[in-house]
């Protein structure tokens, strides 16, 4: 009988959702949906010292924003698999820890942090890989009582079998093996009885009937420890798939302190990126579709995603590629969506007031629409539209070169004259004025359009000229033409 597909994303509530975590969540979601399975969101909050009060809510908000809706979590009916928060499962873990203690597969360890550190330093000095020596592996009841009489609280360590090889098939990496002699007896419960991650995750994955564990390569070294625990309990081991590392643009392993790249989903949201683009981009970080197509909706990704097309080679986080991809989505979005992404940044930058009357809102809407084709993300609208909110023009070097050409004074003077004669000041009227200027001066093409654009915007490239001039307004354009003549 085939086991139902059940996967989980199990973040620790220590901060915002990192792009690496978002990719893991996405791969799990896509795999579950492609197979008609369940996507479980579990909160691994056993590391109480690192937990942040608002982190769980923010993690869930970021997943919802990306469109990764879960089937089971802390906000759903628990059913037979809940609760979905680790600290609400502590009594469950303690029962299983006691089982290992009773079966002599785990033991109490009384070594202090200072003793452990001294042991590690001595091993390093001898050129050995640091690992727990096993000092307290076989303490007698009298020895344990002596430690406890001194008030020393023990941790619980798992008794790792010696001289064995732990092997498993990874859906991404193929056959993987670890020698138990290099692992050392690892801690499964802290002094306060709260379990460590490697223990809690095994118990949870077993009891929640998780069929596939899909996660990042950084968890690969945890896998042999977890498999040893599965075997100690006599439980079926789930299938594993470890996606490749994500490297920064310099091909270095990403650090959360790396300022060369924006690393948290909430930051991309606040900058005005589209969630569809982030999902599309993250899917291609380590997974390759069949064919050359690069733009996929979430539904299309669900249809195409398979683990056998996930690469074990590191994925490069190409910020230019993400900007390009988001631009593709923005160009094809409806204008109201783009306005929602961009307008808050014009307000936050002080370019526009928070309260806009109907006329000013329509002007802002048209302004944003003017740059919809160019925008890579919402916040970029501030820089793109700078010329609409300044008294003086900042000329680029290219614009200065254009304005120095000999035909420019005649073109600009004639254009100013044609604008004065207009009854209206709409894009269609402005195009007529440009055409009349062409007829009067004999200039056409770049010799005609470039001086006008350079004079009114300070640039030699930009959106449709007639719309640009209309939105700048007659008085502003008149003043800029005079300044450039």
From Swiss-Prot:
Recall the GO molecular function terms of this protein's record.
ATP binding; glutamate-tRNA ligase activity; tRNA binding; zinc ion binding
Q: Give the source's domain of life in one word.
A: Bacteria
Top-level enzyme category: ligase
- Residues annotated as binding ATP are 256
Spell out the subunit comment. Monomer.
PANTHER family per UniProt: GLUTAMATE--TRNA LIGASE, GLUTAMATE--TRNA LIGASE, MITOCHONDRIAL-RELATED
**Protein name as catalogued:** Glutamate--tRNA ligase
User: Which species does the entry assign this protein to?
Assistant: Shouchella clausii (strain KSM-K16) (Alkalihalobacillus clausii)
